[in-house]
């Protein structure tokens, strides 16, 4: 198993932020997150392909179109886009959950919410990300908790019991 951290990230982070980043990535390794994502994909991708095939064939037959003709292509594209959207929403929810757990793992290991907060701020600036995108956008497209959600979780950790 490997954890890859790019040199450009290393040079931009202080030691507390880098510790938070490394601990976060190790949290993914410890939790076998790659297998959770792979399991989800192996379950839903065949269902998505089946949906696209059945919906396209049903529409073509209903319209009386030839299944080998070009008229099927727009329907195929539409149903493929719908499948990606409907598979993406729960997949992204799983991804956000995985990322939040890796953040918590990092906080538990480093005991340094300030390092996590600094890391999130720098990553947002470096990646030119919206720190607090609209809720609907996060729900449909967000693969990670928003920067503000992650900072809020780190600050709540700092204020938790025994702090």
Label for each model-derived stretch:
Residues 1-67, 81-163:
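Polar-ligand-bearing catalytic/cofactor-coordination segments
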Residues 68-77:
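Hydrophobic alpha-helical transmembrane segments
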């Amino acid at each position: 198993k490997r954890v890859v951290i790019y040199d450009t990230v290393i040079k931009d982070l202080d030691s507390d932020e880098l510790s938070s980043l490394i601990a976060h990535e190790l949290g993914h390794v410890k939790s076998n997150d790659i297998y959770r994502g792979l399991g989800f994909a192996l379950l839903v991708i065949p269902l998505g392909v089946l949906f696209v095939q059945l919906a396209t064939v049903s529409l073509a037959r209903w319209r009386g179109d030839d299944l080998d003709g070009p008229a099927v292509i727009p329907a195929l594209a539409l149903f493929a886009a719908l499948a990606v959207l409907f598979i993406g929403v729960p997949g992204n929810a799983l991804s956000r959950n995985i990322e939040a757990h890796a953040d918590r793992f990092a906080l538990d290991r480093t005991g340094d919410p300030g390092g996590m907060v600094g890391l999130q701020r720098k990553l947002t600036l470096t990646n030119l990300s919206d720190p607090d995108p609209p809720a609907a956008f996060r729900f449909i497209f967000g693969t990670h908790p928003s920067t503000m959600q992650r900072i809020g979780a780190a600050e709540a950790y700092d204020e938790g019991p025994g702090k």
